[in-house]
Amino acid sequence: MEDQIEQAVDIAIQGVGDPAVRQQALDFCNQVKASDEGWQMCLAMFAGDRKRSDAARYFSLQVIDEALGRLNREQLVYVRDHLFAYVRMGSGLSQGQANVNVGQAVSFADDPVHMKNKLGETLAYLFIMTYTEIWDTFFYDFERLLESPENQFGNPRAADLYLRVLNDIHREIGDTLIIRDPAVQSRNNDLKDLIRNRDMARLADSWKKILMYYKDQQLEPLATEIVNNALRVIGGWVSWAELTLIAEPEALEAIFNLLSSPKSRIHACDCLSEIVAKKMYPNAKFQLIQSLNLTSIIHTLSQSADIEFDERVAKLANSIGSELIHIVETESQEFSANCEALLLDMFPLLLRYLGNEYDDTSSQVLPSVGSYLQLVRRDSKREKAKINPNRLTKNTADQYENFPADRTFISDQRHAVVRSILEAVMKKCRYLDDQEWEEDEDGEFCELRQRLKNLQDMCASIDNQLFLDDVCPVISQALSLPPTADWRDIELGMFELQTLSEAMRSGALSTVKTGQNESPATQAFNNLFFQMVASDAVAQCPQPAVHLLFMEIVVKHSSLFSQHNTNLLNRVLEFFVSPLGIQNSESTKVQMRSWILFHKFCKSVKPQIGQVAQLLVDSIRPLLVIQTEDDTDSDDESAGSAFNAQLNLFELSGILVSILDEASATNGVEQTLQPIFTAVEKAIGVSPPNAESITLVHHNLVAIGTFAHGLDGSSNKLPDGILQLFKNSAEVVNVALDRIPDTKVREAARTVFTRLVPILGSSILSEISTLIQILLQRCSHAELADFLGFLGHLLHSFRNDEGVYNMLKSLLSPLCQRVFASLEELSASADAGNTDDKVLKVEIQRAYLMFIMQILRDRMGGAIVEDKQLADSIIKSVIHYASDPTDIYTCRSAASCLTKMIQLWGNGELEAASAEESVFDQGQKIDGFEQIVLEFSGLCWQVPASSGFNLQDAQSKILVTELGNIQKHIYLKKGDQFLSYLVEQYFPQIGVPDNAAKDYVEKLKTLENKDFKKYFSAFVNELVK
């Protein structure tokens, strides 16, 4: 059987071969894992006479691992005896038990690392299952294996395995980074307590002695691995072991000496980091750091040629710094002063690492630097809170304008450190001389910069003036550089200007005015902003990163432009339309982003653009040609992003055209739309339509709508010539829609008409009617919800237009038939298990109810009740959804529809919601509705009482208040007739006590709607208990 298992495992892991055979092998392996005897076969295979393949042995241990949790005591003892006998023989000793037979194992040193680790992992799992009651001599038995004639720990095979097992035990029960179930965590805590009581002293002694012995065994092949694993064990177990058992002078000296060993110094450094991070009282932690003399040791290790080691030393320095800062935060002033003095000695080292050219090393010290700034800021705020506000003066914005300077609340030492941090951070924010710009905002350096910017913000919030004094000169000097200067210096200045801007927006820098004067930060920024606009270094720098920052900053602060600085405004506009902006051919990212930013900028400064609008329109026009070739060369997401960015230019073109005089505007619209018409005509001529032609039609139609949206903001009435061109657009859309029956084209058509309606109004009712007929015939189930939303939007836009009302009357019956048919098909599919159709069904139900509600709100309910058969179908459907709380949102929407119907039709004829309003066909009789209004009351009680209804759920509570709304509106329409119905007929049926019934009808009569809904909720809660 063992041979079959080995063969199956070897076949299963092969990357080649017959897939069917591999699947059979996998199935066989899974059967072995699941079987009750599988672990025994695998134990025999692993520890048997014959050396199996590594894959088979690894699989055997996996099967044993999974089985351990379900084995009884006798079986666990069996596994222990055989595995430990195997370990003894692998360590070069006899198997130790006459009744246990295992094969002649080879040295563990011959195994690959992954096999050693797997054996250690399995023994750790076995420890967890047996240490409490079965194998309490676990550690003692392993330590006996370590002995050799030369030394108590001189068996390298056993020492290597022993340390791997200890590392795995810590990982399973002591590693706090792993989130575990409460039951598992409780078991782990119990195991740790047992270890502390039984074995911890001996364990700690063994680690130290192993470390001391093997660090000098230069000729032993396993020596380095054993030393490094011993350091890992000490670093891991120290978090939950008694520190005095580990931090003995002899052991610490050995660890310190290993800092100079190229093969072990990284592990030694990590070990010290864990020792420093051990939780203990602040006083004890301070004494530990002092006794270890770590600050001096760190200084001797700094700036190594070994990059990875340098990073670990930085991590250690960060650990020490963070611990010292925590002590300063929590201890008394006298004690924390001594601690802060030690911390200040470390800061030159922390800042040196902060400025390291390797970002991974630099990142290591950011937490401690950030913690120090938080400490200073907290203490500064505490001191500021002591200021008596009665002695201060407030400005018109209710802000204190003569508050003492930030510098007043910071000691000289701390002020100097904050300044040195700020300077180091700014230097680190600069791209290195051999580093290129990262276009990806998620790039490593960009992420690091964001963290550094957060540190700058903290510096700013600590001392505004310090920040301005240090940052502003860097910005000004960069903006004053010649265009031929290193782009990295210019880019740094721009980055810092953006940081200054964001610090003002976030409140890190105060913008409080003093009298009529702007704040120092505002004044400084405004000066630097206009220096940037006028800077040749920025305008002529060839680096796209600089161009992008420039455009981002001017868009955020476009409000600084006015009629008094149009020359600077024109300079910015010129920049945007140059090859550095929207015409950029060097960077696709910058070009697409510039299209978005140019749109935002012009929209903001539209009143100041004036005469240059025509030049801007002409500059944009070449970029309005829609291409689809790139869609096949890149993924759909990037192609879609390019088109979405281009749409900004279409809307911007509309905005700019609206500024022009009538003749120029008409000409501008024609020059924009005519190429689109031509492109659509060409695309719909492709037979049969292909993916490219469909995409081209879609994009061009959406472009029409987006361009129209830009013109929609015009305060003046558009010329007749422009209106006719857009009317032509509506006709083009319908032609394209008729010729290409595709989802994307239908979606684009809805978009275009949504944008044309505000411009053309009722003049395109004929085209809208044609559009709706085509969409109704062709839209799929998936489009139906969007189609209903589109119709609802149209109704609202033309809510006062009788022509649209008449169109709705002719449309509503076939539309509802289509909705009901789709829902019936989807229900059948959903019942058969199609989850997608189940979701789609719910979406259509909700869209349908929203559409009905829109009809009622827009006073067009006459379209529903004109046809009694249609009215009955709609009312029944609404009652059905309102009676089914399995989907709370749908149920609530239906309940709202019923409330509206009762409000408008409750007296048996079409009425307005108030005396100030009117409805179409007001006064029209509604046969039968008045008689069924009282019956609506029943669902108000049936829904909360239905099975599974949770009255404590937030959405359910909202639904119940809507049901109360129905009750109130029935009463408002039916008065005493409804009260009599409740008291004499309905309440007796459902068992409401007489006194409760009387109280209910009294509250229904007297309470306002808002108060009654609260009462109704409480009443229902009591009723369904």
UniProtKB/Swiss-Prot annotation:
Where is the protein localized?
Nucleus; Cytoplasm
Q: Which residues form the signal peptide?
A: none
Q: Name one GO biological process term.
A: tRNA re-export from nucleus
In the record, the note on similarity to other proteins reads: Belongs to the exportin family.
Q: Name one GO cellular component term.
A: nuclear pore
- The intrachain disulfides are none
Function noted in UniProt? tRNA nucleus export receptor which facilitates tRNA translocation across the nuclear pore complex. Involved in pre-tRNA splicing, probably by affecting the interaction of pre-tRNA with splicing endonuclease.
Write down the Gene3D superfamilies for this protein, in alphabetical order: Leucine-rich Repeat Variant
Keywords on record: Cytoplasm, Nucleus, RNA-binding, Transport, tRNA processing, tRNA-binding
Q: Name one GO molecular function term.
A: small GTPase binding
Protein name per Swiss-Prot or TrEMBL = Exportin-T
A Pfam match is Exportin-T
Q: Which PANTHER family match?
A: EXPORTIN-T, EXPORTIN-T/LOS1
Q: Which domain of life is it from?
A: Eukaryota
SUPFAM superfamilies tied to this protein? ARM repeat (SSF48371)
Report whether Isomerase shows up as a keyword of the record. Answer: no
